[in-house]
Amino acid sequence: MGCASEIQAEIFTSFGQLFYASFQTILFLATIIGSLLAIFELCKKTTVPDSTRVLLIGSLFFANAHEFAYFTAPLKVFQLNIFNTNTSCYPLISTRDCIPTTTVLAMGISGNMLIQSALSIDRLLATIFPFSYSRMRALPGFVLLIMVLIPAMFTYSWIRLDIVLDDYQMFCSQWSANISTRANTFLEICSYLTVAHIIINCLIILRNRAIEKRCRFDVTQRYLTSENLKTTQAICYLSIAQFLAMFMYSGGVLLMRKNRENIPTLIYFNVIVWVYAPPYACVSLAPLILFSLWNLKKQRHIQIKSVQSAQKETQDDYIRKLQKSWK
C-alpha cells in the first residue's frame, strides 16, 4: 500500500472533492429510488411490448451496477476526511485490488451502451416482423439482454488483457494508467455507438410512418405500426438523452486523457470528475422511462377518444341519412 503524494492528499481533502462526493451521493440515491419506481411501473400492464420492457429493466440494472461501483469513490472521500486519523498518509489503492470494482464499473458503462443497441434491434424486429414479434412476447428481449450481458461482463477483462496492473491510484473508479490506450479506444467506440443509435432509431421512425400511411385501411397492421411508432419514438428520446450524456463523457474524458500531460494534476482531477457523465445518464434513465410510459399512456387515451368520437359522428351521419330516406 502506497501513500498519496502531497498533491493527491490535497485532492483528497479539497472542498471540491467533498462537494462532488456529496453531489454523487444524491445522484446515487436518486438512481436507486427512481429505478425502483420505474421497475414498478414497467411491471404493470402497459402499452410497452414485453420484449422492450425486459430491455428497459436491463438498462436500469446496468445503470445501478455502475452507480454502486462508482459510489466507492465518494465513500472513500468521506472516509479519509472524517475517519482518517493518520493525516501524514492517505492510502492509495492497488489497481489489482480494484479489479472487482472496476469490472462492475466497466460492465455498467458498456452495458448501458450495448443495451441501446439491443433496443434499436428490438424496434427493428418490431418494424420488419410485427406479427411474429407480437407473438414472441418477451423472448426477443431476453435473448438480446443475454447477448448484451456477456460482452458487458468481460469488457474490463478485454481492456486489461496482457497488461500488468502494478500501479496505485486514489480511487477504484479511476482506471490504471497502464491501460490508457485501450481505455481511449473503448471511449472512441462508445462515441461511435451513440451516434449510430440515434441514426438507426430515426430511420426506424421514418420507416414506421411510411408503413402507417400505406396500411391506412388495414386496421390490425395500422394498430401494430402505430404502437410500434410510439414506442420507437420513446426509445429514440431515451437514446438522445443517453447520447448527450455519453457523448459528453466519451468526448470530454477522451480529450482530457489525451492531454493529461499538459494539465496540472490538481486541476485535472477536480475537473475530470465533472466531465465523467455516466452518473448523469444513470440518474436520468429512470425519470425518462417514467415520462415515456406516462406519455405513451396519454397518447393512447387521446387516440381512443378520437376513434370513439369519429365512430359517434359516423353513426349520427348514418341515422340522418336514414331519416332523410324515409321522408
From Swiss-Prot:
Compartments in which it is found: Membrane
Tissue distribution of the protein: Expressed in neurons RIF/RIG and PVT.
Organism whose genome encodes this protein: Caenorhabditis elegans
GO terms of molecular function: G protein-coupled receptor activity; olfactory receptor activity
Name the record gives this protein: Serpentine receptor class alpha-12
Residues in compartment: Extracellular: 1-18, 75-98, 160-185, 256-270
Keyword Membrane: yes
Family under the similarity heading: Belongs to the nematode receptor-like protein sra family.
Chief location: membrane
Transmembrane segments: 19-39, 54-74, 99-119, 139-159, 186-206, 235-255, 271-291
Gene Ontology biological-process annotations: detection of chemical stimulus involved in sensory perception
InterPro entries for this protein: 7TM_GPCR_serpentine_rcpt_Sra, Nematode_rcpt-like_serp_alpha
Keyword annotations of the record: Membrane, Transmembrane, Transmembrane helix
One GO term describing the cellular component: membrane
Cytoplasmic side: 40-53, 120-138, 207-234, 292-327
Membrane disposition: Multi-pass membrane protein
